[in-house]
Amino acid sequence: MYCIRKVTDDLLWIGGNDRQSPLFESAHPVPRGMSYNSYLLLDEKTVLFDTVDRAVQTQFFENLEHALGGRRLDYVFVHHMEPDHAATLGDLMIRHPEATIVCNGKSLNMIRQFHCTDPKGVLLVNDCLLYTSPSPRDGLLPRMP
């Protein structure tokens, strides 16, 4: 049974809650459980932000399919490759081979190693483009004397 949360009109939380695992990353106690967050943007194109840990994969895939409502999944944005963000990426790409993976070069190497030997669609992004700040030369900030 699906369990999703509406964040905005076109953004849904489709992750899952794990109340069984005693430790996060085998090191940090989580006596009340933990949440694996994944979000789906439903716009002209559909964009999935991260997958989840295998502990909640059944719930995640039920949530995803319900939220998509028969629409195709266009993009999967991979923030980084730790299991709480990407453990079910390989299974996702089997279910949705039409999706283009959006990631950086380091993540792509790990995807090829751990999940998909040859992802069909990949859009590489430069880490620097994702984390830029305005600078004085952009004209958005005053120049310092």
Regions found by a protein language model. Name each.
Residues Y131-D138:
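Conserved small/polar residues in nucleotide/adenosyl-binding loops
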Residues G121-D127:
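Short acidic-hydrophobic, aromatic-tinged amphipathic segments that line or gate anion-handling sites
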Residues E44, A55-V102:
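Active-site metal-binding motif and surrounding structural segment of the metallo-beta-lactamase
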Residues R143-P145:
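Hydrophobic alpha-helical segments, chiefly the membrane-spanning helices
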Residues V102-C103, S107-R112:
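Anionic-ligand anchoring segments at beta-strand to alpha-helix junctions in alpha/beta enzyme folds, i.e.
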Residues L68, D118-G121:
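A short alpha->loop->secondary-structure connector
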Residues C3-L64:
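Conserved beta-strand hairpin/beta-sheet module of binuclear metal-dependent hydrolase folds
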